[in-house]
Design a protein with these regions (language model features):
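Short acidic, glycine/serine/threonine-rich loops at helix termini
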Residues: 18-24, 51-54, 78-85, 185
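Conformationally flexible catalytic loops at phosphate/diphosphate-handling active centers
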Residues: 67-162
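Short coil/turn connectors at secondary-structure junctions
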Residues: 2-8, 27-28, 35-38, 62-66, ...
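Thiamine diphosphate
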Residues: 18-20, 33, 144-213
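A glycine-rich helix N-cap at a beta->alpha junction
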Residues: 3-13, 91-99
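Conserved thiamine diphosphate
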Residues: 21-73, 97
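Short, solvent-exposed amphipathic alpha-helical segments in soluble enzyme
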Residues: 2, 54-59, 84-87, 185-194
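Acidic, glycine-rich active-site loops and adjacent beta-strand->loop/helix elements
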Residues: 1, 11-18, 46-47, 73-75, ...
Length: 213
């Protein structure tokens, strides 16, 4: 992240061992990565993993920020589900070839040498660290741009945050991961009974774009 190199780590999120070992899914492992500088994109279902993983890859290249693309361990990672798969030509159509070429040109090459891995004093180090903030500020728009391209191709409605429920909800859950499918079914039941409830499904967790809520 510090060198603004794109990359995607796909993570089936699981619990960190504490008083006992647990290999089931919570988000304690990926939560430990919040301050690494990686963007974090979360999916709620197997179909969403298929649809949004390309968004992580394409946004990483164009936005120059690495991604942790995560989904719930076992509940999503090992679920057997019928899904619609992508054609590689469709993915190719969405790729920003200029951004890909710029990434390739950034590789170490004796024809255009560059300096990396320097040691800096505090007066320079903090300025250089702050200089990367515009890339993080711009990243939510890049992610939404690719979500829009996915939506256009397959008829979905992916956003940084998706709302589901009553328009005049009095109680709202904010959730991330496979629990959203269960929450949606519960909301259908409760709204049918006259309850005013809803859920905000978080997809882009880092950088968190409050303006998109």
């Amino acid at each position: 992240a510090g060198e603004q190199l794109p990359g995607v780590i796909n993570v089936s999120a699981r619990a960190l061992a504490s008083h006992a070992l647990s290999i089931f899914g919570d988000h304690s492992d990926v939560m430990a990565c919040r301050q690494t500088g990686c963007a974090m994109l979360c999916e709620s279902s197997v179909q969403e993993v298929m649809d949004l993983t390309p968004v992580a890859h394409l946004a990483a290249i164009k936005g120059k920020v690495p991604f942790i693309n995560f989904f719930d361990g076992f509940r999503t990672s090992h679920e057997i589900q019928k899904i619609e798969t992508w054609d590689y030509e469709d993915l190719k159509d969405m790729a920003d070839m200029e951004a890909i070429q710029a990434f390739r040109d950034h590789a170490l090459n004796p024809n255009h040498p560059c300096q990396r891995g320097s040691a800096q004093n505090p007066d320079i180090f903090f300025q250089a660290r702050e200089a990367c903030n515009p890339f993080y500020d711009a990243l939510p728009a890049v992610v939404q741009e690719y979500m829009d391209k996915v939506n256009e191709k397959i008829g979905t409605d992916y956003k940084l945050f998706n709302y589901y429920g009553a328009e005049d909800a009095e109680h709202i859950i904010i959730a991330m991961g496979s629990v959203n499918d269960t929450i949606e079914e519960t909301i259908d039941y409760l709204t049918a009974a006259g309850k005013k409830v809803g859920v905000v499904k978080v997809r882009l967790y880092r950088p968190f774009c409050a303006q998109a809520l």
